């Protein structure tokens, strides 16, 4: 849902999103351009959660007014905060607007604890390694493994079963993971059935 609201492209995106949600009720999350104006619509249409970044992180800072509005609109049980980040000066900062704009908010265990009362889950893309199939961000995962709270899902660079093992080890079995371009269904080499078997055996 990255096209601007009101454009023909947005309407086409919305139509396809609704069709997918109806086909698998409460099985999909929706992200991209989610605001307080459309979040409830996605939940009503069947999304289990909405994923939010830019609406909450405005002008480089956490906009607690918008965050409170979103929680009131859909409930924290339906809200995933996307804290996708890039490294700058040795620290990880949340980025917005298709990962192009740095915020002033650093991703730390303290930040995760501060925001956990507003959300059901965190989604954290390691933007510097995202989509490259060149390995995971071990430093970021190690930091996430120090957090005890709501579920955390890491994304970025997973391209092998060794990477999955590292996520489990470095994340102390507390960090979930997404796999994108490395999966066979997206043109990669990792067979979905083998991934599921590996995870269940682990």
Positions of PLM-derived features:
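Active-site beta-loop-alpha junctions enriched in small/polar residues
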Residues: 2-4, 33-35, 55-57, 84-88, ...
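Charged helix-capping and loop-helix junction motifs
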Residues: 11-18, 63-68, 104-109, 134-143, ...
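Catalytic cores of alpha/beta
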Residues: 16-49, 139-177, 193-195
């Amino acid at each position: 849902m990255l096209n601007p609201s009101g454009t023909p492209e947005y309407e086409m995106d919305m139509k396809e999103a609704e069709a997918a949600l109806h086909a698998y009720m409460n099985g999909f999350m929706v992200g991209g351009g989610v605001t307080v104006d459309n979040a409830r619509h996605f939940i009503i249409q069947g999304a289990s959660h909405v994923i939010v970044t830019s609406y909450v992180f405005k002008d480089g800072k956490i906009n607690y007014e918008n965050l409170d509005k979103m929680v009131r609109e859909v409930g924290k049980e339906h809200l995933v905060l996307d804290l996708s980040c890039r490294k700058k000066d040795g620290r990880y900062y949340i980025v917005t607007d298709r990962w192009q704009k740095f915020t002033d908010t650093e991703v730390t265990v303290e930040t995760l604890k501060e925001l956990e009362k507003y959300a059901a889950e965190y989604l954290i893309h390691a933007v510097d390694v995202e989509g490259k199939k060149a390995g995971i961000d071990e430093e970021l995962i190690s930091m996430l493994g120090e957090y005890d709270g709501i579920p955390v899902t890491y994304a970025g660079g997973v391209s092998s079963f060794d990477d999955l093992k590292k996520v489990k080890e470095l994340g102390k079995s507390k960090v979930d993971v997404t796999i994108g371009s490395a999966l066979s269904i997206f043109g990669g080499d990792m067979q979905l059935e083998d991934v599921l078997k590996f995870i269940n055996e682990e």
